[in-house]
Amino acid sequence: MLSSAIAVIAFAIGYLFGSIPFGMILTRIAGTQDLRSIGSGNIGATNVLRTGRKGLAAATLVGDMLKGTAAVLVAGLLWGSAAAIAAALGAFLGHLFPVWLKFRGGKGVATYIGVLLGLFWPAALAFCAIWLLVAFTTRYSSLSALIASFATPLLLWWLGHPQLALLLAVLTLLLWFKHRENIRRLASGSEGRIGAKA
């Protein structure tokens, strides 16, 4: 059984990994406009893409994914699967609410995939497949994430991973909360599509 102290340490490690704002760092290095002042105001890869810099968007996506994966793997190797779950939650919350940016972070899609990759990679592949299918047919990044994240806990439960299903259900609720403005724009027909510049 995981001790409370180890759980807190694993969570803290995850939070520190997750709070690294790759989108902000990379766009500042590249000299582009402040991400928080364009498009959705999000610091993630989709908003970086709206700057027209596809390479930066790809690098942001990879960075935001791998910080979640790294947090899970480090905690898992040091203290086991229960610690990996604590680190996954920490990494996701770190991305959503980074202390370095006054707790105003991204929406969590890439980090969601990253923690899934570290916890149970087939579910990460399933998430990506659903995301790509919806994105290809609708060109809405937000809708793709909402549908893929809704399906993920159900898939994990069906595959016999109730602990992971519960964790991902919590992450999904947080992801939907961070997408609440996107949901309103989707309902009104004003949501920006993938590839549209700010």
From Swiss-Prot:
* Keyword Membrane among UniProt keywords: yes
What UniProt keywords are attached to this protein's entry?
Cell inner membrane, Cell membrane, Lipid biosynthesis, Lipid metabolism, Membrane, Phospholipid biosynthesis, Phospholipid metabolism, Transferase, Transmembrane, Transmembrane helix
Return the InterPro entries for the record.
Answer: G3P_acylTferase_PlsY (IPR003811)
Q: Which domain of life is it from?
A: Bacteria
Record localization: Cell inner membrane
Q: How does it sit in the membrane?
A: Multi-pass membrane protein
Q: What class of enzyme is it?
A: transferase
The record's subunit annotation is: Probably interacts with PlsX.
> What exactly does this protein do?
Catalyzes the transfer of an acyl group from acyl-phosphate (acyl-PO(4)) to glycerol-3-phosphate (G3P) to form lysophosphatidic acid (LPA). This enzyme utilizes acyl-phosphate as fatty acyl donor, but not acyl-CoA or acyl-ACP.
Assigned protein family? Belongs to the PlsY family.
Name assigned to this protein: Glycerol-3-phosphate acyltransferase
Q: Which organism is it from?
A: Nitrobacter hamburgensis (strain DSM 10229 / NCIMB 13809 / X14)
Q: What is the lineage of its organism?
A: Bacteria, Pseudomonadati, Pseudomonadota, Alphaproteobacteria, Hyphomicrobiales
